[in-house]
Amino acid sequence: MCGIVGAIRAHHNVVDFLTDGLKRLEYRGYDSSGIAVYSDGKIKRVRRVGRVQLMEDAAREKGISGGIGIGHTRWATHGGVTEPNAHPHISGGMIAVVHNGIIENFESERKRLEGLGYRFESQTDTEVIAHSINHEYAQNGGRLFEAVQEAVKRFHGAYAIAVIAQDKPDELVVARMGCPLLVALGDDETFIASDVSAVIAFTRRVAYLEDGDIALLASDGIKRLTDKNGLPAERKVKVSELSPASLEPGPHSHFMQKEIHEQPRAIADTAEVFLDGGFIPENFGKNAKSVFESIRSVKILACGTSYYAALTAKYWLESIAKIPADVEIASEYRYRSVIADPDQLVITISQSGETLDTMEALKYAKSLGHRHSLSVCNVMESALPRESSLVLYTRAGAEIGVASTKAFTTQLVVLFGLAVTLAKVRGVVSGEDEARYTEELRQLPGSVQHALNLEPQIAAWAQQFAKKTSALFLGRGIHYPIALEGALKLKEITYIHAEAYPAGELKHGPLALVDENMPVVVIAPNDSLLDKVKANMQEVGARGGELFVFADLDSNFNATEGVHVIRAPRHVGELSPVVHTVPVQLLAYHTALARGTDVDKPRNLAKSVTVE
């Protein structure tokens, strides 16, 4: 991990693209960066720990320029955060490699290569790739494509790699297995990247590589491509919908703030498919109706924020569609003994569509005999939709901040639409209820905007939170996952320890933490559980805890000493979890501002998790 770029340019200096592309990948998270460029007859390399700008300044100072090169932002997995461990890695002055992923058998490969006389300068698994390719390159008489083909046969794990050779200044070879990689085509220039955001300022014509692909590139495009079976293949070139403007924060201080405020638009765009065409199976794929008619239960697999969206969906699926639903963390599911049901729909959720644990969990489910799969993700042409029989994309647009915001709320919209659609197919929803759900969905962007208007009040709360070291979030029923999401957001970007519990579990342990120094955030909409939540709040107040309550206009809460209340719009029915997500996002954002942390790029975290 975490970002790859590369290019062959016939008429321009490749360093301009490499540094610009790496800066556009900074949002994915990293600890060091580097580039390798064919310059003045040899491969020249610059690596630095810290920001890409430090590395760029060093490259400019050295006067590095050329027409072919590769670059990388690293998020340490094997080996510490040091310059020798940063990419690119070079073998024998001949082969330079950048790599995302993890080579699981790197220790045995390292011993094999050491036995062949190769010396290692780093602790990384990537240096194994460089030496292995160099060895094959020397053995086959200098054929780079074939050297990569042979080398990758030895690797176990996930990888996306880009390779250049000192004596092949017009060839760039790439390979993909389990980690994202694309090829972008310009005029007499060809680019590669792990994310389309890196290339969008230079071209919008992209081809997404698939697992097992190996490609030979020149400045005029893809010269050779083989698939996982070693057979010649082609990958369709598409015009990306992403615009350069979407990759800038505009008038906002941070991408996270921008993306929080983009939620009314993102939700409206995502809901459009249901509002225009209705809750019909065809929204999810051509054969969705027959799949939905045949399934008896649902299994949802996801990680991180997407897992909390899945937990929310469980309530909708069981209450609206009347279908049993089970939710699991993908990284846990893929390593346990599972009883498979071929009539169960497996749903996977991932913002990027490339989350490795989620992808591998889906493959595992299919290997056990699951016949039906549906993915919910935000990135067109990503791996997860290609592996799934059905798909519905969120329309959140590019999300740059590491802490997910609009991707989460648009996932909720899609999952709500799925629940109502399944209810229709199963004949368990009345026309009156369907009309009510449609109207709630239509009004949702406006309700979210009303919640955004609470920002000044929430920012005032944040000044108090900034001085705390821990926080507790409480919710009940379908709002418990929103409490989980609020706690995750706070810990991600403020580094304040935060936990979330169902409010009814207070007496089973968490109440021991409550004192005057522990802020307790309560999600308290005016639903059937409101009186229960109020009773739980009394328990907190009796122990001297300070309560911060996100309520509805009609929840009948009064602010008193030790009880702070902010009222969201009037209760909006089944979609209340979406509206109540916004205040906890804003609380985390403004607390991070008050503490002076890096909002968009919090420490130790990556946007797209493409390794275990």
UniProtKB/Swiss-Prot annotation:
Residues of the active site: 2 (nucleophile), 607 (for fru-6p isomerization activity)
GO CC terms in record: cytosol
Reaction catalyzed: D-fructose 6-phosphate + L-glutamine = D-glucosamine 6-phosphate + L-glutamate
Enzyme category, top tier: transferase
HAMAP family associated with the record: GlmS (MF_00164)
Originating species: Neisseria gonorrhoeae (strain ATCC 700825 / FA 1090)
Pfam family, one: GATase_6
SUPFAM superfamilies: N-terminal nucleophile aminohydrolases (Ntn hydrolases) (SSF56235), SIS domain (SSF53697)
Gene (name only): glmS
Function: Catalyzes the first step in hexosamine metabolism, converting fructose-6P into glucosamine-6P using glutamine as a nitrogen source.
Known EC number: 2.6.1.16
A biological-process GO annotation: protein N-linked glycosylation
PROSITE patterns linked to this entry: GATASE_TYPE_2, SIS
Keywords from the named record: Aminotransferase, Cytoplasm, Glutamine amidotransferase, Repeat, Transferase
Protein name: Glutamine--fructose-6-phosphate aminotransferase [isomerizing]
Quaternary structure note: Homodimer.
